[in-house]
Amino acid sequence: MDRRIGLTSPSPKSTEKSGRDLRSGGDANGGANTNSNSIPRGDKEKGVNVQVILRCRPMSDEETKSNTPVVISCNERRREVAATQIIANKQIDRTFAFDKVFGPASKQKDLFEQSISPIVNEVLEGYNCTIFAYGQTGTGKTYTMEGGGTRKTKNGELPTDAGVIPRAVRQIFDILEAQCAEYSMKVTFLELYNEEITDLLAPEEPKFPIVPEDKTKKPIALMEDGKGGVFVRGLEEEVVYSAGEIYKILDKGSAKRRTAETLLNKQSSRSHSIFSITIHIKELTHEGEEMIKIGKLNLVDLAGSENISRSGARDGRAREAGEINKSLLTLGRVINALVEHSGHVPYRDSKLTRLLRDSLGGKTKTCIIATISPSVYCLEETLSTLDYAHRAKNIKNKPEVNQRMMKSAVIKDLYSEIDRLKQEVFAAREKNGIYIPRERYLQEEAEKKAMTEKIERLGADLEARDKQLVELKELYDAEQLLSAELSEKLGKTQKDLEDTKNVLHDLEEKYNEAESTIKEKEYVIFNLLKSEKSLVDCAYNLRAELENAAADVSGLFSKIERKDKIEDGNRSLVQRFRSQLTNQLDTLHKTVSTSVMQQENHLKEMEDDMQSFVSSKDEAAQGLRESIQKLKLLHGSGITALDSLAGEIDMNSQSTFERLNSQVQSHTSSLEQCFGGIASEADNLLNELQCSLSKQEERLTQFAKKQREGHLRAVEASRSISKITAGFFSSLDVHASKLTSILEETQSVQDQQLLDLEKKFEECAANEEKQLLEKVAEMLASSHARKKKLVQTAVGNLRESAVNRTSHLQNEISTAQDFTSSVREKWGFYMEETEKNYIEDTTAVDSGRSCLAEVLVECKAKTTMGAQQWKNAEDSLFSLGKGNVESADSIVRTGTEANQSLRSKLSSAVSTTLEEIDIANKALLSSIDSSLKLDHDACANIGSIIKPCHEEISELKGGHYHRVVEITENAGKCLEEEYLVDEPSCSTPRRRQIDLPSMESIEQLRTPDYDELLKSFRESRASLKQANGDMKHFLEVQEATPPSITDPRAPLIARN
């Protein structure tokens, strides 16, 4: 069997030659032309740059022990490599930028996941991709591509040092198995050694070859297809079904690769190797047509360039190194020509560049892994590798997706291949055809010619052997005897042959029966396939529904993840807002506590001042009491003196009248007629005198009463002052206690509200977490509203309580101010009342003095009138009795003198009383003035104390207001601006009707019972026999059925 394969030729093509060519994507596909899914026209015209990855190996143990200087530094974050070079005692740093940079500490897994994994995914999308390692010998190319030498997995996992090839294989199988795709996979493994291509998967040759000069590994020809592509004729392909099989093939091929020990590498690869994986994946178009998607991955491990003088290569190793350097030099020239857009690119100068032609400037996606050494001893080779790799970045490929093939075209191609193989097998069985490769046939023809010449040379020896003919005749006689024996045996054998013919006839009958049974089985299989096709169609429909459902579930999960992320952000925001609110409330609490302490200090000072003021007022009140007591005593003594004087006047008047009465009675008899009129006048005069005396007594009594009332008013005024002062200070204490209680209530209410807010928030969060799994959509919609409403309510309550407490403080302050103003007004009113009482007392004293003067004047006038009357009576009665007149005159004179003395005593007593009253009033006024002065001083002190208290309370009010405003703004900012709300992305899947097949339709897909199928098949067979009369027509009808009946299984169904 002749197989030919190219590096980038995964698409099979039917051909008339004996063999199957796999050429680059874009060739004809056996008449099954389909639209190729290529990259956009803009990218196709512009091209895609070759991806270049740089990896620096770590220092070896020998380099570490010898303290070899490091001249390479890798910056993986900036994707740069810096090389330090000393020229003419001057340090020069050269920096190279690549697509990816991996330093000495990088892992195999990191390199694969970051750079190679996307390329493997593109292979599964239908692209041709090439990955090859390039660099100096001993820099880790083979380690990067294949790994540390062991591919045994632990618990299904690859070892940590597994390279690109095993990891790519594992990823391909994992993705295909996860997609439940139908696929087939083939691998090839070739080696390029000294410009000769060797198949590493070819079977081992015989130990004793026909031609002695034949080698163990036979070179294979490199052919061109005339369209710019190349392919390798006769390359062995292995069909693989698992990653383990590929690992075995890799181990098998790697064991055949040529390696040798040099001074730079203990196991240096002396050849280039190319491991290719071709994948055919079946997929369905939108019209339900089955297509084959083809992708190919080429994994190239290049031999490293080396300096012969430094590597120690001799003889054959030197020739190997020369061929390696020659091919790599050609690769460098190709890279330079592609970068410089040269008209001629020297692909044909080396087989390596011919094999990599499509990977460099062609239709393949290419990734170059450049490996370097950090040692100063390898600086020249390292700079060369960096220059070539940096130039290779500018190579532009134009990758295209391979054309998809129809399944029917692939099946047709496979049928033609099967027919060709059948013909070869038949020819081999009949031994009448050429069934070996053309090269082997030509080789055997040459061998036959050599043998003919040898026979001619031995013809001369035949005559010499004629002498042996006699001996041979004797042997012939012996053979005749043996022939007779054999004839007898032949008779027996013929008899056995007859028996065998009979058995063969029986076998033919059984064969016919078996053939009819096979036809029955084929009929049953046909019906089973028909049912299977219906089930497959139903399964495709269900798969489409499942994909839609999976997309919906993915959308729902993404929405849930987005909402969880927003909820986490909101939860952290609320926690941060809670801590900020707690800090601000602590600051506010400290401010209020400081203000309360200051208010307590001020109130304590005010209390001390008021205690001193009360003590001074007590002393002043005590002085007033003493002054009033003295005034009362003075007033009582004056009243007593007046009473005694009035009594003396009464007694004198009575004694005088008694004497006059006795004198008059003694003269009554004599003067009764004469003094009738005079007596009446005297009686009238005495009556008027008594009336005036009684009026004077009443006026004195009223004056004393007014004095008592004035003093009582002064005492009541002092008592009212004391009561007002005491009430003022008690009200101040009440207001201070109210302020303290309001502040404490404010603090307690705020703490309680914060605790309630925290409890409500925790309860709300707990309830949401419990209900989140049951009502995700509803809870996410209502969570924000409830939390916002809860926090707004709490903040509103805080605002209202702060406003209420502020208004309470303002009311208390205004109440204290009003009370202070009312105290001032009462104090002024008391001063006015005191002055008014003083003026009334002074007026009363003056009026009493004037009344007493008038009474005295009236008494004097009346006394004068009485004297005149008595003189007139004396003159008129002189004639009546001179002696009586003298006695009466003496009596009257005595009475007048007594009255005058009494009047003088009364005047002196009144003046003395008035003077004492004036003195007492002045003392009382001086004490009142001193008390007023003390009261004014106390009011000034209270005002000086109240003013800073008022200022501090105003500052506390402003600070409290600003703090509350700040808390409100922070809360509003946190809950209105920073609090995230899940905005609809319009990507949530809508409710739709899922088309589920009914149980009846599913039951209709079931294949009928085996007995019923046989019964129907036999009835149709009997009807055909009756119509045609033989079985031949029936067989022709059966052979005319579609090929799917005789060959029911699709050749590309995965059997893993």
From Swiss-Prot:
InterPro entries: KIF11-like, KIF11-like_kin_motor_dom, Kinesin_motor_CS, Kinesin_motor_dom, Kinesin_motor_dom_sf, P-loop_NTPase. Its main location: cytoplasm. PROSITE patterns: KINESIN_MOTOR_1, KINESIN_MOTOR_2. GO terms for cellular component: cytoplasm; mitotic spindle; spindle microtubule. The keyword Nucleotide-binding applies. It comes from the Eukaryota. One of its GO terms (molecular function) is microtubule binding. Residues 443-525 form a coiled coil. GO terms for biological process: microtubule-based movement; mitotic spindle assembly; spindle elongation. Residues 1-44 are annotated as: Disordered. Residues 49-395 form the Kinesin motor domain. ATP binds at residues 135-142. Pfam families: Kinesin (PF00225). The keyword Coiled coil applies. It is found in: Cytoplasm, Cytoskeleton; Cytoplasm, Cytoskeleton, Spindle. Keywords: ATP-binding, Coiled coil, Cytoplasm, Cytoskeleton, Microtubule, Motor protein, Nucleotide-binding. Residues 14-24 have a biased composition (Basic and acidic residues). Responsible for microtubule translocation. May be important for the organization of phragmoplast-specific arrays of microtubules. Plays an essential role in stabilizing the mitotic spindle. Required during mitotic cytokinesis. Belongs to the TRAFAC class myosin-kinesin ATPase superfamily. Kinesin family. KIN-5/BimC subfamily. This is Kinesin-like protein KIN-5A. It comes from Oryza sativa subsp. japonica. The gene is KIN5A.
